[in-house]
A protein has these predicted regions:
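A short, structured active-site edge motif that brings together acidic residues
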Residues: 1-7
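General small-molecule cofactor/ligand-binding pocket signal
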Residues: 2, 68, 181-183
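Active-site adenylate/phosphate-handling loop in enzymes that bind or generate adenylated species
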Residues: 8-94
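Soluble or luminal CAZymes and related metallo-dependent hydrolases
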Residues: 23-27, 114, 118, 164
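Peripheral terminal appendages
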Residues: 39, 117, 122-201
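Short, electropositive alpha-helical surface patch
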Residues: 55-62, 110-113, 198-201
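Mid-to-C-terminal catalytic subdomains of enzymes
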Residues: 72, 76, 82-126, 131-135, ...
């Protein structure tokens, strides 16, 4: 287990648009001496062909440390990786995507352990209720925190029942959220990056 210290870095906790750079920089800083000590010539990480064109500041840290991305280099996208792992009988074939919880917080709003705990607890509520494609976005607002839910389109109809919504809202309040809303556009990978893409033109 590698213990990283990104929360000690204000550049990370301030949550700028290149937050992932500071996270990966911290990780590779810790891994590099371990690789040298173990006699490993190359460090690798999990970027793949589906990530090409997305907002990926962590890739800049990988370039700085000369960390390889073999899945991307082989041209393998997420669907192909899942198919390959299924053919090999690996248990990760159907594992839901689990990007960093900090990606649920809008840029410019501070990343804190408390917020991440709220997000993790809230997403656990939805998964325990049988939802598979879920994201809970944490938005600061006057007087508390808003949870914006993104669910897969196929699962949204099941959510909007009165009893389900009431139960989820109650458990989200227990997690620390004051308000809960459903994004009717459904789950969108990297939805908080949409403003970054627009800014880039």
């Amino acid at each position: 287990i590698i213990h990283t210290q990104e929360f000690a870095n204000a550049d990370y906790t301030g949550n700028p648009v290149n937050r992932c750079y500071y996270c990966k920089h911290e990780l590779f800083t810790r891994l590099e001496p371990i690789a040298v000590e173990g006699g490993f010539a190359v460090l690798a990480y999990g970027e793949n062909a589906s990530d090409i064109g997305d907002h990926r500041p962590g890739a800049e840290a990988a370039k700085l440390f000369e960390v390889r991305a073999p899945l991307k280099e082989a041209g393998l996208a997420k669907g192909e990786i899942r198919a390959l792992t299924a053919s090999l009988g690996l248990p990760t074939a159907d594992k839901p995507q689990m990007p960093c919880l900090s990606s649920r917080i809008p840029y410019g709003q501070a990343v804190t352990p408390g917020k991440l705990a709220m997000i993790e607890q809230a997403e656990g509520v939805l998964r325990d209720a049988g939802f598979s494609e879920v994201r809970v976005r944490h938005h600061e607002q006057p007087g508390g925190a808003l949870a914006k839910l993104e669910l897969g389109q196929a699962e949204m109809e099941r959510f909007v029942g009165e009893e389900m919504m009431a139960n989820v809202a109650a458990q989200f309040r227990e997690a620390g959220f004051t308000d809960v809303t459903l994004d009717t556009r459904g789950y969108r990978r990297g939805s908080l990056n949409e403003g970054v893409a627009l800014a880039k033109g």
